[in-house]
Curated annotation (Swiss-Prot):
GO terms for molecular function: asparaginyl-tRNA synthase (glutamine-hydrolyzing) activity; ATP binding; glutaminyl-tRNA synthase (glutamine-hydrolyzing) activity. It is an enzyme of class 6 (ligase). Belongs to the GatC family. It comes from Chromohalobacter salexigens (strain ATCC BAA-138 / DSM 3043 / CIP 106854 / NCIMB 13768 / 1H11). Allows the formation of correctly charged Asn-tRNA(Asn) or Gln-tRNA(Gln) through the transamidation of misacylated Asp-tRNA(Asn) or Glu-tRNA(Gln) in organisms which lack either or both of asparaginyl-tRNA or glutaminyl-tRNA synthetases. The reaction takes place in the presence of glutamine and ATP through an activated phospho-Asp-tRNA(Asn) or phospho-Glu-tRNA(Gln). SUPFAM superfamilies: Glu-tRNAGln amidotransferase C subunit (SSF141000). GO terms for biological process: glutaminyl-tRNAGln biosynthesis via transamidation; regulation of translational fidelity; translation. PANTHER family: GLUTAMYL-TRNA(GLN) AMIDOTRANSFERASE SUBUNIT C, MITOCHONDRIAL. It catalyses: L-glutamyl-tRNA(Gln) + L-glutamine + ATP + H2O = L-glutaminyl-tRNA(Gln) + L-glutamate + ADP + phosphate + H(+); L-aspartyl-tRNA(Asn) + L-glutamine + ATP + H2O = L-asparaginyl-tRNA(Asn) + L-glutamate + ADP + phosphate + 2 H(+). This is Aspartyl/glutamyl-tRNA(Asn/Gln) amidotransferase subunit C.
Length: 95
């Protein structure tokens, strides 16, 4: 799949990214090379190869799932300017 100059400008417009004509030309080349690499990857025969969840066959050592911090809600809410019913009241941002 070939990327054209108009495709780059349209993508920039949709992403709300300011992009000059000279910058777009550079991105056309870069994106075309990226898509060529993707095409090469898709051409590889992966039949019979199990999918990987992670490229390394290592297990992660996890710490025990123990409570290390206790509930301090009342202490933290005492510092807040306004609370009600255990909730923090904040100024309205969206009308």
């Amino acid at each position: 799949m070939a990327i054209e100059h108009a495709d780059v400008l349209r993508a920039a417009h949709l992403a709300r990214v300011g992009l000059g004509e000279d910058e777009a030309t550079g991105y056309v080349d870069d994106l075309s090379r990226i898509l060529e690499m993707v095409d090469q990857l898709q051409a590889v025969d992966t039949q019979g190869i199990a999918p990987l969840a992670h490229p390394l066959d290592a297990t992660q050592r996890l710490r025990p799932d123990e409570v290390t911090e206790h509930n301090q809600r009342e202490r933290f809410q005492a510092c807040a300017p306004v609370t009600e019913g255990g909730l923090y009241l904040v100024p309205r941002v969206v009308e």
